[in-house]
């Protein structure tokens, strides 16, 4: 067998075939080294495609790339920002996160991976990723490698200095972007404070702040986003974290916060469409809508189960 690296990994993972444990160890180490170089608010230049939650829906992630003009390649020069929640709930969290990591290694300056509330040891032990790794590898080793990568994911990205991209939302502890830049991010998602709020908070039709029903983060209102954007010279906050049936939604009359949701037919039953937000040099967002793949995760999983059942009787 020849030397295996990102090119071989990409060909394999594109077919939804998970990598060996030793390949995963090597991949996670490479990604960690790249992420260590990034700041808490990673600057990204337009043109860029912004993507919301994926939640382990691997075949829909492939559809996302088709909708956005293809996987990053030497020909496709678009930048991509992913807003977190790569894992849990879907059947192929492992393959989803692996594909994104391989693309990060191949095109480090074109793929920006932001941390979501599900990129956490505690949450993945409840919502599926831990169990998936255990089932697919027979141990928790690969889950541990991935969790180490989670700890180094950036907290935010900023497009041309004007569009802030985070997973969840704002925090009463953060008024200035510089307060995000100095947070210590190489750790498990905390239960409270600025870091926690960035991945857990939601916009709501209120004036300022309210307690979040999620039990972490806050609800923030139009006055909060208006002041935050004014102080930091921003024109828009792009975030994910909440299912929107129509794929994207602007909040508040100023339209200064937008939710981008990229998991179609969420959990294989919600019936929603998904979107990506494309931003050109004029910084005008353009949304591309896509639907779940017909022969997607469910049929692949069912076929695998049938194969296992037939093998059992051989």
Curated annotation (Swiss-Prot):
Keywords (A to Z) from UniProt: Cell cycle, Cell division, Cytoplasm, Hydrolase, Manganese, Metal-binding, Mitosis, Protein phosphatase, Virulence
Disruption phenotype: Causes growth retardation and leads to significant reduction in virulence.
A GO BP entry: intracellular signal transduction
Cellular component GO terms held in the UniProt record: chromatin; cytoplasm; protein phosphatase type 2A complex
Enzyme class, first EC level, given as a word: hydrolase
A GO MF label: metal ion binding
Chief place where the protein resides: cytoplasm
EC annotation from Swiss-Prot or TrEMBL: 3.1.3.16
Record-listed Mn(2+) 2 binding positions: 85, 117, 167, 241
Gene3D superfamilies: 3.60.21.10
A Pfam family that the UniProt record links to this protein: Metallophos
Active site as annotated: 118
Required cofactor names: Mn(2+)
Cofactor remark: Binds 2 manganese ions per subunit.
Record's subcellular location: Cytoplasm
Amino acids binding Mn(2+) 1: 53, 55, 85
Reaction equations catalysed: O-phospho-L-seryl-[protein] + H2O = L-seryl-[protein] + phosphate; O-phospho-L-threonyl-[protein] + H2O = L-threonyl-[protein] + phosphate
Subunit details: Interacts with MDS3.
Protein role: Serine/threonine protein phosphatase which is involved in the dephosphorylation of the large subunit of RNA polymerase II. Is required in late G1 for normal G1 cyclin expression, bud initiation and expression of certain genes that are periodically expressed during late G1. Plays a role during hyphal growth through the regulation of cell wall biogenesis, osmosensing and protein translation. Involved in virulence in a mouse systemic infection model.
UniProt similarity note: Belongs to the PPP phosphatase family. PP-6 (PP-V) subfamily.
Official protein name in the record: Serine/threonine-protein phosphatase SIT4
């Amino acid at each position: 067998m020849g030397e295996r690296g990102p090119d071989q990994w990409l060909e394999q993972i594109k077919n939804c075939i998970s990598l060996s444990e030793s390949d995963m160890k090597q991949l996670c180490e490479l990604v960690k080294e790249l992420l260590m170089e990034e700041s808490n608010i990673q600057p990204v230049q337009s043109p860029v495609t912004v993507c919301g939650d994926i939640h382990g829906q691997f075949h829909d992630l492939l559809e996302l790339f088709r909708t956005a003009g293809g996987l990053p390649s030497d020909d496709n020069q678009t930048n991509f920002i992913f807003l977190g929640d790569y894992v849990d709930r879907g059947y192929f969290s492992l393959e989803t996160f692996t594909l994104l990591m391989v693309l990060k290694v191949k095109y480090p300056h074109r793929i920006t991976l932001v941390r979501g509330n599900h990129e956490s040891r505690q949450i993945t032990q409840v919502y599926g990723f831990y169990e998936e790794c255990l089932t697919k590898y027979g141990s928790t080793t690969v889950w541990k490698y991935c969790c180490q990568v989670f700890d180094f994911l950036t907290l935010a990205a900023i497009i041309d200095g004007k569009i802030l991209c985070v997973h969840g939302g704002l925090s009463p502890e953060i008024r200035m972007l510089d307060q995000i830049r100095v947070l210590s991010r190489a750790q498990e998602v905390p239960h409270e404070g600025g870091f926690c709020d960035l991945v857990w908070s939601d916009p709501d039709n209120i004036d300022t702040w309210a307690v979040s029903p999620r039990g972490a983060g806050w609800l923030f209102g139009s006055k909060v986003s208006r002041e935050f954007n004014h102080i930091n010279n921003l024109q828009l906050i792009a975030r994910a974290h909440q299912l929107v049936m129509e794929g994207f939604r602007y909040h508040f009359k100023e339209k200064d916060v937008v939710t981008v949701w990229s998991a179609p037919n969420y959990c294989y039953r919600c019936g929603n469409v998904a979107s990506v937000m494309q931003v050109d040099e004029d910084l005008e967002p353009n949304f591309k809508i896509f639907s779940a793949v017909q022969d997607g995760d469910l049929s692949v999983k069912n076929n695998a189960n049938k194969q296992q059942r037939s093998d059992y009787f051989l």
